[in-house]
From Swiss-Prot:
A Gene Ontology molecular function term of the record: UDP-N-acetyl-D-glucosamine:N-acetylmuramoyl-L-alanyl-D-glutamyl-meso-2,6-diaminopimelyl-D-alanyl-D-alanine-diphosphoundecaprenol 4-beta-N-acetylglucosaminlytransferase activity
Family of the protein in this entry: Belongs to the glycosyltransferase 28 family. MurG subfamily.
GO biological process: carbohydrate metabolic process; cell division; cell wall organization; lipid glycosylation; peptidoglycan biosynthetic process; regulation of cell shape
Protein name: UDP-N-acetylglucosamine--N-acetylmuramyl-(pentapeptide) pyrophosphoryl-undecaprenol N-acetylglucosamine transferase
Biological source species: Clavibacter sepedonicus (Clavibacter michiganensis subsp. sepedonicus)
Membrane topology summary: Peripheral membrane protein
CDD domains: GT28_MurG
Reactions the enzyme catalyzes: di-trans,octa-cis-undecaprenyl diphospho-N-acetyl-alpha-D-muramoyl-L-alanyl-D-glutamyl-meso-2,6-diaminopimeloyl-D-alanyl-D-alanine + UDP-N-acetyl-alpha-D-glucosamine = di-trans,octa-cis-undecaprenyl diphospho-[N-acetyl-alpha-D-glucosaminyl-(1->4)]-N-acetyl-alpha-D-muramoyl-L-alanyl-D-glutamyl-meso-2,6-diaminopimeloyl-D-alanyl-D-alanine + UDP + H(+)
HAMAP family tied to this protein: MurG (MF_00033)
EC number(s) per entry: 2.4.1.227
Pathway entry: Cell wall biogenesis; peptidoglycan biosynthesis
Top-level EC class as recorded in UniProt: transferase
Role summary: Cell wall formation. Catalyzes the transfer of a GlcNAc subunit on undecaprenyl-pyrophosphoryl-MurNAc-pentapeptide (lipid intermediate I) to form undecaprenyl-pyrophosphoryl-MurNAc-(pentapeptide)GlcNAc (lipid intermediate II).
Compartments where located: Cell membrane
C-alpha cells in the first residue's frame, strides 16, 4: 500500500487543504499510510491528531528575510531538517511527498528530491510563497488554486482542496440547524466576522466599535476573534463572540454575509458555498490576499476594502445596508458560487496518485 507524506502547516490556510487531501486519499485507498509533517507550534499540532493522522515534527524554520544572525544559523538548521526528513522517508518507506507550503514544506521538498521520491505541490494563493516556488522546481506535478499563478509549466488549476464538511455543505438545508447549534436566532440577518485562525486585530477593533449599532437594526453577529487575540466581549445583545471555531461549516451555513480576510482558504470556502462577503486583505506580506480576491470581486460575489479604510463609518455605510438587502445578497451569492469550486481535493488527489503511478520503481536513496 502507498505511504504518503503530506508536508505543511502553521495556519489554517496550510492545514485545512492538507487535511482535505489526506481525507480524499484515505477514502480512495483505506489501507494506505498517511503521515503529516509539520511543527509543534503550528495549528497542525492540534488538528492533525484530532483528524486521526500521525504527525511527524521538525523544528520551525522561518526563511530569513535579511542578512543577520538568524540567516547565519538558518543554513545548518535547514540542512539538519533535510537530513531528518530523509531518514523519515527511508524508515517509513514514503512513496510521495505532497507539500502545501509553510515551514515544513521546503526541507521536505529537498529531502524527497535527494531520496528519489516524487514531489507534488499545492499552492493555495495567487502569489506563491517561497517554499512552493522552491518545490515547483523539483515537482512532478503542481496544483494551483487560481488561474495565472506563476509556478512553471507543470502548474495545473485544481482549485482549493476543501474539507468534506465544506465541499458537501448544503447551506439552505442546514442553515436553521446551524444557527440553533451556535445559539443564534433562526430568522435574523446574520453577519459572520472572521479574521482566520489567528484572528485579525484591526477587523476585531472596528467591528466591536459598531456591534451595538449593527444589532440595533435587528441583525445578529457571530464574531470569531481568533485564539491569539486579546479581546474583551462588550456584552452587546445578539453579538456572539468566540475565540476559534473547529466547526466553520456551521458558521458559514449560518451566515447571510461574511466579513473576512482574503486568505485563499477562507475565500475558497466562501465561494464554494456561495456566501457573499466583504474582503479586507491583510495589509502586510507580499500582497497575495489582494490578488486572491480579484476574481470573486470582478464576478460580483464580493466587495473588497483596504484594511486602512475598514473603519466604523465604512461598516455603517456599506455592511449594514447590504445585510438588510436580501435581493442584493442573493445576487452576490450566485456570483460567488460561479467562481467557486468544490472538487479541489479530488483533483489534487488525482495529481498525487498519478505521480505515484508514474514512478517506475523505488530507487536507492542517494547519500
Amino acid at each position: 500500500m502507498t505511504v504518503y507524506l503530506l508536508a505543511g502547516g502553521g495556519t489554517a490556510g496550510h492545514v485545512n487543504p492538507l487535511l482535505a487531501v489526506a481525507d480524499e486519499l484515505r477514502a480512495r485507498e483505506p489501507g494506505s499510510t498517511i503521515l503529516v509533517l509539520g511543527t509543534r507550534e503550528g495549528l497542525e499540532s492540534r488538528l492533525v491528531p484530532a483528524r486521526g493522522y500521525e504527525l511527524l515534527t521538525i523544528a520551525r524554520l522561518p526563511f530569513p528575510r535579511r542578512p543577520n544572525g538568524a540567516a547565519v544559523r538558518f543554513a545548518p538548521a535547514f540542512t539538519r531538517a533535510v537530513g531528518q526528513i530523509r531518514r523519515m522517508i527511508a524508515e517509513r518507506g514514503v512513496d510521495v511527498v505532497v507539500g502545501f507550503g509553510g515551514y515544513a514544506a521546503a526541507p521536505a521538498y529537498l529531502a524527497a528530491r535527494r531520496s528519489g521520491v516524487p514531489v507534488v505541490v499545492h499552492e493555495a494563493n495567487a502569489s506563491p510563497g517561497l517554499a512552493n516556488r522552491l518545490g515547483a522546481r523539483v515537482a512532478t506535478a503542481v496544483g494551483i488554486t487560481f488561474p495565472g499563478t506563476a509556478l512553471g509549466p507543470r502548474a495545473e488549476v485544481v482549485g482549493m482542496p476543501l474539507r468534506r464538511e465544506i465541499a458537501t455543505l448544503d447551506r439552505d438545508a442546514v442553515r436553521d440547524a446551524a444557527r440553533a447549534e451556535l445559539g443564534l436566532d433562526a430568522d435574523r440577518p446574520t453577519l459572520l466576522v472572521t479574521g482566520g485562525s489567528t484572528g485579525a486585530r484591526s477587523l476585531n477593533r472596528t467591528v466591536v466599535q459598531v456591534a451595538e449599532r449593527i444589532t440595533a437594526t435587528g441583525a445578529q453577529i457571530l464574531h470569531i476573534v481568533g485564539g491569539a487575540q486579546e479581546f474583551t466581549d462588550p456584552g452587546v445583545e445578539r453579538y456572539h463572540v468566540v475565540g476559534y471555531s473547529d466547526r466553520m461549516e456551521l458558521a458559514i451555513a449560518a451566515a447571510d454575509l461574511v466579513v473576512s480576510r482574503a486568505g485563499a482558504g477562507a475565500l475558497s470556502e466562501l465561494t464554494a458555498v456561495g456566501i457573499p462577503a466583504v474582503y479586507v486583505p491583510y495589509p502586510v506580506g507580499n500582497g497575495e490576499q489582494a490578488v486572491n480576491v480579484r476574481g470573486v470581486v470582478a464576478a460580483g460575489g464580493g466587495i473588497v476594502v483596504a484594511d486602512a479604510d475598514f473603519t466604523p463609518d465604512w461598516v455603517l455605510a456599506h455592511v449594514v445596508p447590504l445585510l438588510s438587502d436580501p435581493a442584493a445578497l442573493a445576487r452576490m451569492s450566485e456570483a460567488a458560487a460561479s467562481v467557486g469550486t468544490r472538487d479541489g481535493a479530488a483533483r489534487m488527489a488525482d495529481l498525487v496518485r498519478d505521480a505515484v503511478a508514474s514512478r517506475p520503481s523505488r530507487p536507492a536513496v542517494r547519500r
